[in-house]
């Protein structure tokens, strides 16, 4: 069970920030006491920015949040081992499924069994890490099959920790069964963690006979900070509005009482009316789903998650956000959590 002290980190997306910006904020976050830095797979791949971050920071743990399983297992395992070597084993491979429409329309990948595919994906990658020229790897899973895979360079660190992004109960149970940690997605509530996340993670652990003592609970968390609390809360509405359009967040939104606004947001999204989407997001949604307000307020809001998670990964809103706003908020969230 997580303790009462929260580690914090920052996740960088490919939106509204140049690579130079990301490196500047990475150094700023390290100086401020951040424990980890993470990269998404939006606009850029998830690994290259992390390699750059590792080269300009001194001791930061870095991780993908997340790389999707649309990439062939071989490409992911080699990238992960290279990152582990570069960081002296201070890298986390965060994996996720991505929305079904993205897999089908962007990757040409039809995934009708995401949990089975993720199980195969993790097991296959771990087995590939044990391979060599003289010890070829075979993997015969339900979805993924590999035959005679030769690892031309022995893995410098063949036990890279794998964390899974999970929202639904089946994926949460798989995470507890086979992963080293959880990367909860960025719309969540304390109720969701206590009533959905922990029971299902523990069910997966029981299935595998694990005690879970080394398991890390992480969550991406939307964070908007401004001396003007209304401006911060309005900025956070951008991400709430966008992610409320994705059906797999129903498990978070509906029990929290947000089924009605969610449906209206989706109708506005279908009509291409972004201003209407933002207006539909209620004050209660902002209170429950994100960290938003002044620096003092967001630090107090973060304390609600003590005992529920180990690591808070701060995510600056990006959807329909101007570049200047995005840059200012990255600096503000880092300064708000500075030691």
Task: Please give the residue ranges for each predicted region.
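Active-site-adjacent structural elements that line small-molecule/cofactor binding pockets in enzymes
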Residues: 1-339
